[in-house]
């Protein structure tokens, strides 16, 4: 801090003592500002739009409830999030939340890279909850999602395709918020303490 001040350089101060999983808006918002500065872009307007979205979160919570309704009877089973590249980080975060909050298992498969693995591994019914996150950016990847969804649903697997419209920061924050709720409700149903995470407590 003193070095930055001595050279009149901007710097960011991050408050200590918070668990990152409890302050994702703060943490991701700070990272967005830093990356924006490195790229020479002012991200404050975009972050204000996201903040405004969260001031009226009813639509996101409704989407989370819809997703929860799909998985409620199988909530204790493992989750596999099938995503495209744009949503890989969001998928990983949800799996971390399922592991930390609900003490469950979560795995990520990225299409098209894991396309063959998915098809070879899932040609039967599994005790698995599948969530699809596809930005729709690539026509060939879209076709893979469609095919895989058909395979899984025809075999009786539970699949929820989250209706993301694009890969924007706004959409990604929305999906994070909705899936965070899902992980909390999963912890409630499993009667586990979502505040107790042994490895970080």
Predicted feature residues:
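C-terminal active-site/capping subdomain that shapes the small-molecule cofactor and substrate pocket
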Residues: 120, 125-197
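Active-site phosphate/pyrophosphate-binding segments
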Residues: 36-129
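Glycine-rich phosphate-binding loops that contact phosphosugars or nucleotide phosphates
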Residues: 1-60, 72, 135-159
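Short glycine/serine/threonine/alanine-rich loop segments
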Residues: 9, 103-104, 157, 192
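Short beta->alpha junction loops
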Residues: 15-17, 111-112, 161-167
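Short, charged, surface-exposed secondary-structure boundary motifs
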Residues: 20-26, 116-119, 171
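Hydrophobic/aromatic beta-strand patches that form the interior of the parallel beta-sheet core
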Residues: 10-14, 80, 107, 129-133, ...
């Amino acid at each position: 801090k003193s070095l930055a001040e001595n050279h009149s350089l901007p710097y960011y101060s991050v408050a200590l003592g918070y668990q990152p999983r409890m302050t994702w808006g703060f943490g991701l918002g700070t990272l967005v500002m830093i990356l924006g500065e490195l790229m020479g872009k002012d991200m404050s307007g975009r972050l204000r739009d996201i903040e405004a979205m969260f001031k009226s979160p009813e639509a996101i919570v409704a989407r989370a409830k819809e997703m929860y309704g799909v998985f409620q009877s199988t909530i204790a089973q493992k989750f596999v999030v099938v995503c495209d590249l744009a949503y890989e980080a969001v998928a990983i975060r949800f799996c971390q939340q399922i592991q930390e909050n609900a003490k469950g298992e979560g795995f990520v498969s990225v299409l098209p890279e894991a396309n063959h693995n998915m098809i070879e591994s899932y040609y039967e019914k599994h005790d698995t909850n599948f969530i699809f996150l596809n930005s729709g950016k690539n026509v060939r990847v879209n076709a893979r999602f469609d095919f895989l969804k058909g395979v899984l649903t025809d075999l009786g697997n539970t699949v929820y395709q989250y209706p993301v419209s694009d890969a924007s920061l706004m959409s990604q924050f929305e999906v994070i918020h909705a899936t965070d709720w899902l992980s909390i409700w999963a912890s409630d149903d499993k009667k586990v303490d979502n505040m107790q995470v042994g490895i970080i407590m």
